[in-house]
């Protein structure tokens, strides 16, 4: 399944707020909610499916990518669900987003693809690049990219940057301090349901 490129508002109306996908908030009429949920028993499969879809759309990844992350998380020591979230959160495109350098993850991915981002002084054009503690994230010395990021930073710095990241406005430099903990996830998600969804595939 390819990466979603359709209307974003339609997705958040169904799944709820997904800040990585869009900074818009879902607005549902109470009547539509009642019509869709009244007298209907939601199956456990649907609940798990929707939690899985939240991860897919929020982080902007394909079905195959998410399944691969689940498989990696299963092989690692510790809580599979928490490790899965850590893997997704440490993606370069997500780190750029969480630093406030872009308003969405698709915007961050575009910066990476266009070779505007450096990690430890080297250009990295792979959005899925897995960041590590002590990695420095900077931008190329180009007026256009600096102007875009500076504008975003001024607006999004009012939102709290998670504790595992630090951003220096003076140096225009982001730092990965450590692997994040569960409390720093910027998404309302039950990751255990996602793991259960893939229990027969991973």
UniProtKB/Swiss-Prot annotation:
SMART domains associated with the record? Ribosomal_S4, S4
Q: Which SUPFAM superfamilies match?
A: Alpha-L RNA-binding motif (SSF55174)
Alphabetically ordered keywords of this record: Chloroplast, Plastid, Ribonucleoprotein, Ribosomal protein, RNA-binding, rRNA-binding
Listed under GO cellular component are: chloroplast; small ribosomal subunit
Q: Name the domain of life.
A: Eukaryota
Q: Which InterPro entries match?
A: Ribosomal_uS4, Ribosomal_uS4_bac-type, Ribosomal_uS4_CS, Ribosomal_uS4_N, S4_RNA-bd, S4_RNA-bd_sf
One GO BP on record is: translation
- Which Gene Ontology molecular function entries are recorded, alphabetically? rRNA binding; structural constituent of ribosome
Pfam families found in the cross-reference section: Ribosomal_S4, S4
Principal location class: plastid
Q: What residue stretches are annotated with the S4 RNA-binding domain?
A: 90-153
Where in the cell does this protein reside?
Plastid, Chloroplast
**HAMAP family in the record, alphabetically?**
Ribosomal_uS4_B (MF_01306_B)
What assembly does the database describe for this protein? Part of the 30S ribosomal subunit. Contacts protein S5. The interaction surface between S4 and S5 is involved in control of translational fidelity.
Per its UniProt record, what NCBIfam families does this chain match?
A: PRK05327.1, rpsD_bact
Functional summary from the UniProt entry: One of the primary rRNA binding proteins, it binds directly to 16S rRNA where it nucleates assembly of the body of the 30S subunit. With S5 and S12 plays an important role in translational accuracy.
Q: Which family does it belong to?
A: Belongs to the universal ribosomal protein uS4 family.
User: What is the name of the protein in this document?
Assistant: Small ribosomal subunit protein uS4c
Which organism is the protein's source? Hypopterygium laricinum
Provide the gene name from the record.
rps4
């Amino acid at each position: 399944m390819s990466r979603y490129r359709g209307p974003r508002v339609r997705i958040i109306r169904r799944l709820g707020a997904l800040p990585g996908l869009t900074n818009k908030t879902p607005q549902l009429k109470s009547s539509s909610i009642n019509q869709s949920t009244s007298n209907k028993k939601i199956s456990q499969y649907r609940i798990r499916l929707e939690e899985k879809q939240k991860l897919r759309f929020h982080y902007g990844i394909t079905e195959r990518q998410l399944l691969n992350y689940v498989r990696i998380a299963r092989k690692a020591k510790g809580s599979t669900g928490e490790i899965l979230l850590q893997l997704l959160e440490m993606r370069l495109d997500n780190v750029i987003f969480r630093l406030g350098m872009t308003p969405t993850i698709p915007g961050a991915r575009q910066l990476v693809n266009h070779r505007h981002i450096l990690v430890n002084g080297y250009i990295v054009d792979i959005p899925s690049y897995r960041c590590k503690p002590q990695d420095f994230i900077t931008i190329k010395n180009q007026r256009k990219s600096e102007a875009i990021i500076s504008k975003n930073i001024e607006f999004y710095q009012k939102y709290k940057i998670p504790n595992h990241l630090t951003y220096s406005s003076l140096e225009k430099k982001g730092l990965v301090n450590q692997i994040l903990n569960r409390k720093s996830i910027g998404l309302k998600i039950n990751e255990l349901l996602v793991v259960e969804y893939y229990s027969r595939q991973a």
